[in-house]
């Protein structure tokens, strides 16, 4: 049977490892428990988390047990990694609700039945910690000098780093130790921005338990220009269909740049590598076949085959002019009374764009169309003349479509 390490390596997930040869040997001969942490700062996972979910799924398919840790405790502090400002603190109720939402989304590609995967909340052990005992047992193993060299703290030192956030690395290291003791968890995985925190946990277990522990980071999902993928004009690309519709989700992947198709097929689908190579070799107009496959496969994983098929049909209807299938396109319904209002007001009210200012910005940039006509007037008012048989068609940029139907 193929070693999952080789699968992860071939598909390009792996960025850094603590002990490469040991990890490869371990994954090939034993079934291990490993964990990935999720920071519950929102009530939905987004595309940035999707790559982590894929790694968990590949590992589970090879017989290893994923532990999904939600940071109900650390979430009350906030991870300073990659942040320029201190995060707003959330209530316990918010965090608990977000954790429940995460499990539902993770369960779409991770099997939680019969102890094949487990979800834990670090609030269970962090919230009742005795501070003096924690300092004596854990704090003694952390060098402040060494911590200050970590990338996650460097960028914050000039602007100000609170002692609250400085504790985050100790908390995350303690999470790994706790999971090692309770579940024999021997490996922590995470995005490459978590490397310093992962090293801290590996080192803590080796010091406290005199046992082997390992860490692995994987590449972040970036485009060919090095920018993080998953951002749209409306904000983040969420996995919750209420926040990002299956159609919008499908369209995002259908419209990725040609240069990003191969990477996306490798990292966020389960297509065999031979098929990935075949699709990635297509050129010219044929690359659209690869993009359609990518969009369908990714949407199917997150929203199910039925929703993926609906999104595909709606996208093809739009370009093929088949009006009867437009019902699968993101559609907002308004009353007749809502007409004769400024377009920017309606776009914000229908949540097609996050705000009026965003709508104005898009109009100024020449990126907004009504019924395929470019909008040049920021004060444009929609009237009955704009209502067609299919509703009012709104296009953002070249390929993002919405429909407004007047009831």
From Swiss-Prot:
Residues annotated as binding ATP: 231
Protein location: Cytoplasm
GO terms, molecular function: ATP binding; RNA binding; tyrosine-tRNA ligase activity
Main location per the UniProt record: cytoplasm
GO annotation terms (biological process): tyrosyl-tRNA aminoacylation
Record field: catalytic activity: tRNA(Tyr) + L-tyrosine + ATP = L-tyrosyl-tRNA(Tyr) + AMP + diphosphate + H(+)
Residue numbers covered by motif 'KMSKS' region: 228-232
CC terms in the record's Gene Ontology section: cytosol
Domain S4 RNA-binding: 341-405
Keyword Translocase annotated: no
Alphabetical keyword list: Aminoacyl-tRNA synthetase, ATP-binding, Cytoplasm, Ligase, Nucleotide-binding, Protein biosynthesis, RNA-binding
Entry EC number(s): 6.1.1.1
Residues reported in the UniProt entry to bind L-tyrosine: 35, 168, 172
Record carries keyword RNA-binding: yes
Residue window of motif 'HIGH' region: 40-49
Quaternary data: Homodimer.
HAMAP family: Tyr_tRNA_synth_type1
Family: Belongs to the class-I aminoacyl-tRNA synthetase family. TyrS type 1 subfamily.
Purpose of the protein: Catalyzes the attachment of tyrosine to tRNA(Tyr) in a two-step reaction: tyrosine is first activated by ATP to form Tyr-AMP and then transferred to the acceptor end of tRNA(Tyr).
Name by which UniProt lists this protein: Tyrosine--tRNA ligase
